[in-house]
Amino acid sequence: MVQSSGRALKVFSGLSNLTLTQEICDFLKIPMGKSEVIEFKNENLLVKIGENVRECDVFVIQTSTSPVNTRIMELLIMIDALKHASAARVTAVLPYF
């Protein structure tokens, strides 16, 4: 288990670029965090965190692909879900390419 500041490190991905997140997790030799993002027909989003993140350092990787507004809301809702799940720190990683 990779640790950061003595805490477990977890990496989650939004829907924008799962391949990039998987490559980062493979490099770090850790599994990608389990989460589910549901987009409803009325464009509302629901994010479910599928594992324990209590007292972990969590990184969320989300690129700004189209539709940008939806991807940013997805990121913010995921951060909120992680904080409500008692993650110690949540860091957003937004690569731009």
PLM regions: where:
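PRPP-associated nucleotide enzymes
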Residues: M1-F97
